[in-house]
Amino acid sequence: MADGDGEVSALVCDNGSGMVKAGFAGDDAPRAVFPSIVGRPRHQGVMVGMGQKDAYVGDEAQSKRGILTLKYPIEHGVVSNWDDMEKIWHHTFYNELRVAPEEHPVLLTEAPLNPKANREKMTQIMFETFNVPAMYVAIQAVLSLYASGRTTGIVLDSGDGVSHTVPIYEGYALPHAIMRLDLAGRDLTDNLMTILMERGYNFTTTAEREIVRDIKEKLCYVALDYEQEMANSLTSSQNEKNYELPDGQQITVGNERFRCPEVLFQPGLLGQESVGVHETTFNSIMKCDVDIRKDLYNNIVLSGGTTMFPGIADRMSKEITAVAPSSMKIKVVAPPERKYSVWIGGSILASLSTFQQMWIAKAEYDESGPSIVHRKCF
């Protein structure tokens, strides 16, 4: 992957709790998008000589899910199992992108407020296991903002494992005002599993959960007025949709369609103490300097797969208008490519000429050790 002037393109790898997005800097979309899953056989090899692997990664794990136990090495946006994480990176470089990592600088992404030890471990694995020539760790929400063409704004980044509101001013995240909400796509999937059970549909295994995730992605939406929508659903069935399961049977989904994502705005429905995404965003803005709040209200950027529900931007706008000062201009931006905006921002950043002196080079790592990441990546 060399450019005309002999430069090697950087690799950009956005490791989400649910999906890995990976590709080459300068591209406008990731080449590889696959689930962040490592699967191990549930039963010892029945068929001798079938060449069964001890672990499967990504789509292969997904397709063999019937015989595997699936584990996600990234929980709530933070890596919790480094051995599995290494398998995912290995799979990304060698099987998905088909590159030799020792030949390319690598840009990785991390959750806001990622523990220091985690950044060091990422750095160490990249340099020592994969022998990369250079690497950098960027905060996910900041990359999403770059992808939307802004340097100031507040990003609501909601993925599969965690949601964050991150105020950013002139390209720098304001750590004191970042809020984290442990409520995201996976919780919505679990919630949908629960409310579908009330209808008598039983989904329990890790494999069946993936079916429910698909129902969520295809059929759910956010109601502008939840109470009103609930009332409507009790009187008419025009909101009902059918979904065909892998075995061909049809199930009917009604008010579950908007009840599922409603917990983003009312975590109380799940029995969670926390406040909803709109209030979290508002609290984040209020923690910022009074002079920059106007710029934040006017640049609320949605990012991540869990912001893909139809109706979410309008609802967000409505809820924030209700709590903000009445004269304040409020703008919620929901870019169509927001599912991949973290990756796209990484692709933009890693191909900027001004960024080239920001990389941590192998020589610097050899000299200073893993702690170099705190000095060079902020």
Curated annotation (Swiss-Prot):
SUPFAM superfamilies: Actin-like ATPase domain. Its EC number is 3.6.4.-. Keywords: ATP-binding, Cytoplasm, Cytoskeleton, Hydrolase, Nucleotide-binding. It catalyses: ATP + H2O = ADP + phosphate + H(+). It comes from the Eukaryota. It is an enzyme of class 3 (hydrolase). Its main location: cytoplasm. One of its GO terms (cellular component) is cytoplasm. GO terms for molecular function: ATP binding; hydrolase activity. Gene3D superfamilies: 3.30.420.40, Actin, Chain A, domain 4. It is found in: Cytoplasm, Cytoskeleton. Pfam families: Actin (PF00022). Coiled coil: none annotated. Actins are highly conserved proteins that are involved in various types of cell motility and are ubiquitously expressed in all eukaryotic cells. PANTHER family: ACTIN. Belongs to the actin family. This is Actin.
